[in-house]
């Protein structure tokens, strides 16, 4: 279903350090989580690790995750007893091996080039943090709502000089963060 990414002969994805690790907290999301996994496995950035943290789900979320992990070795499963969102995120970040961390909620469906574009900007300008816009889509509507359309995209800015940009898009899942930061 998804290619494992490029690596040297005999080297598994577990040996090669990815550029980006995407942490996904999971708790009882069996119904819509496969669409999120499809979006992550279809990313144009192949040098990607998907760290899925199962927070003691009581539905079939873990089974869905295990099935996907058999198809794509970039998926790393962290299975733990339920301890809440914050603890799950901390476990995922600790397990992540990438130089940059992305966060995706299980009901998010990132566009195919999201992480490639964010990583390119982060590397080109040596950024600790890169943010992006997002669309909202509701099951009962056909349209997508673009948030923050008037913001300056594709430009560098100092968050001290323009704090409204960081404060207005505070969602952790709209960015890429240098792990060492």
Tell where the protein language model's regions lie, with residue ranges.
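Nucleotide-sugar donor-binding/catalytic module of glycosyltransferases
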Residues: 4-6, 11-181
């Amino acid at each position: 279903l998804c290619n494992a990414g490029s690596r040297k002969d005999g080297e598994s994805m577990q040996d090669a350090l990815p550029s980006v690790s995407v942490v996904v907290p999971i708790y009882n999301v069996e119904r819509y989580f496969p669409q999120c996994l499809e979006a992550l496995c279809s990313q144009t950035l192949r040098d990607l690790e998907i760290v899925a943290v199962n927070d003691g789900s009581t539905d079939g979320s873990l089974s869905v995750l295990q099935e996907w992990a058999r198809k794509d070795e970039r998926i790393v499963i962290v299975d733990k007893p339920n301890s809440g969102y914050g603890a799950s995120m901390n476990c995922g970040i600790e397990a992540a091996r990438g130089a940059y961390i992305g966060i995706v909620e299980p009901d998010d469906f990132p566009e195919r080039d999201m992480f490639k574009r964010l990583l390119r900007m982060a590397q080109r300008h040596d950024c600790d943090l890169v943010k992006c816009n997002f669309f909202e889509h509701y099951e009962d509507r056909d349209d997508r709502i673009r948030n923050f359309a008037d913001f300056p995209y594709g430009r560098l800015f100092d968050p001290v000089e323009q704090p409204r940009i960081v404060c207005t898009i505070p969602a952790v899942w709209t960015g890429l963060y240098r792990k060492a930061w």
